[in-house]
């Protein structure tokens, strides 16, 4: 397993953004050097969380940055995230 590098740990919150804006900000954070990303979504249904997590994971994979899912083992397993 690849070691996690928490030197620039980015924790997300999509509450005040459209999905397009949120995904843009995630990608900008990764372009800016984020080394670990935690998806934290407290107000989404399981289906909404999985859908968003799949999109975020596609982006983090392009930058070879691990994705951590906050508090939801089921979501992490559903998308094969790197951690919970």
What are these regions (language model features)?
Residues 1-84:
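Conserved N-terminal beta1-alpha1 strand-loop-helix module at the mouth
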């Amino acid at each position: 397993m690849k070691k996690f590098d928490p030197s620039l740990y980015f924790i997300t919150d999509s509450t005040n953004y459209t999905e397009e804006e949120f995904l843009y900000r995630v990608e900008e954070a990764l372009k800016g050097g984020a080394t670990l990303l935690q998806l934290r979504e407290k107000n989404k249904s399981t289906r909404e969380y999985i859908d968003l997590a799949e999109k975020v994971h596609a982006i983090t994979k392009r930058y070879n940055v691990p994705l951590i899912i906050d508090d939801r083992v089921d979501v992490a397993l559903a998308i094969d995230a790197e951690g919970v």
